């Protein structure tokens, strides 16, 4: 008797394809042709986010305060076959924010995604010893610039029918890091900014969410993990007893920018190994 059909291996592959399509797994590029701006994206968490967004199909504009850092990041990501350009941007300067948005519009026709990641933390010590100019600098860059860059980018998102914004806060918003008082306060402020922006921008179909990373191994957080005793003290508060990796933040951000998160706004996702995350 002649038996007609697919070989067993082919049947298995066909069935796997059906299952992947049924649950949305067949969509290889969830951010296909989206245009994304990522601030402070030449190193650490920002760089990992830029890479992941580009891997997921977005055209990404990376930025940093130094041209050599921008050039290095762009060269690295282009070397991986990703669609990436870059420009210098100090988010505390209005002209730099304007140039960042203009670069995306000129090269790609608009903006769909903003990742607000830039932050400074120039002080380590008692909150009672913080000079006024340090307060001004931290709040200017970490909070005010985030709001003003959002203001600059929303009209471009509206032209394209909406968009997604992810603000990068920190677990320090919930559980303050010792001796980093002004930074902790600024990151708590971003939780409130996220809620307010989400409320106001919903009518423009712009979603606003927040990422709160825990202790992630980056140059920015080195002061917290380079000393073994301090590192062990901090890790003792984690349920997952290790320092996180930038890539463990990037996937969450890509999800929040995708259609899979189309009914999520005003929320903060904590990526912190089980650290306490309640105000």
Swiss-Prot record:
The record marks 196 as: Important for the maintenance of the quaternary structure, the catalytic activity and cold stability. The modification N6-acetyllysine is found at residues 93, 106. A motif (Peroxisomal targeting signal) lies at residues 277-279. Its main location: other. GO terms for biological process: ketone metabolic process; retinal metabolic process; retinoid metabolic process; steroid metabolic process. Primate DHRS4s display different stereoselectivity and catalytic efficiency in the oxidoreduction of some substrates as compared to other mammal DHRS4s due to a difference in conserved amino acid residues. This is Dehydrogenase/reductase SDR family member 4. It comes from Bos taurus (Bovine). The lineage of its organism: Eukaryota, Metazoa, Chordata, Craniata, Vertebrata.
